[in-house]
Amino acid sequence: MEKRNSVDTFIKKNQNFEEKVIVRRTSDLLLTSKQNKGLKYLNNQKNSKELLKSPSKNKIKGLINSNTILENEFKQAAPNLNKAFKDFSFIQFQNESYRDYMEDRFSILMNFPNDDNDKAIFAIFDGHGGSSISEYLCENFISVFLKYYQKYEKQNIEKILQKCFSTLNDEIKKISKSDEMGSTATIIFLTKETNQLLGSKKIIYCANVGDTNCELFSKNNCKRLTYEHRCSDSIEENRIKKNNGNIINGRIGGRMEISRSFGDFRLKDYGLICEPSINKMSINFNEKYLLILATDGIWDFVSEEEMFFITMNNNDSMEICKLIVDKAKENGSTDNMTCIIINL
């Protein structure tokens, strides 16, 4: 196995957040969120064949925490960029004045097996009742996806995503010590499709449970790719009631506002499920788009109009991340916040 690059770590104080920012350099392909606060990344990583050989060991050997390359290496990395995206940035903000713990997590896979460099996965998880389930998903979602990706020969991404949610929720039920912990999830899978008549297009698959949302921004408009699963939604309310569930004071079983999640097994009899909403859309290669994934600590406090204004008036994805989190704080958010900006 190729020897890893040396890891450079530095800590700086960000004027906006007064938070430690930990940045590391590596050639590895997986990025997860155990320590990162915020940084920008252009990928320069080796292939990932070993992940499919033993996905069950991925959380120990294949999953590298909090690793990126440094900003001054972006141009050097450019010849090896993943074709699915141009760059991405992210910020995680605990909001320590109000929150004792960080329950948000994310995982990112930037190169697929067999040097398949036109695909990528971005996954974001917002835990509640503790971080155990969001942490488990952070460490295991991508390895389970790769297992099914190989099994179903890459042909049915919707089926692969459904199997991932079902399998992981079943595993969580087996090992969880509490039925009061849970997590939302939003998964983005980027790929391309080629048609003899229409040519090649970028394809975005989005799967989610809960209220961790994703929107696609262009110069003219924005489109939400996730479906927000809350008891206040009429479709979710009808589904719950049709299945003999119950909503009390706008909460499923009188306990929780979201109606789909991983875990939260005490609410299963009240109508809570872990079946994802899945959306697929195509975009042109020659047009500029930004994907924004964020937890509800941001979406509940930053309007679509405010996000659109920020994206239209700034070109740098890291700066957009900072401005969005600043706006959420300014508008009164007291929650953990995670924001990922993907420049397509």
Task: For each feature predicted by the language model, list its residue ranges.
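PP2C/PPM-type serine/threonine phosphatase catalytic core
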Residues: E2-K3, V7-N14, V21-R25, L31, ...
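Metal-dependent phosphate/diphosphate-handling catalytic cores characterized by acidic Asp/Glu clusters
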Residues: L42
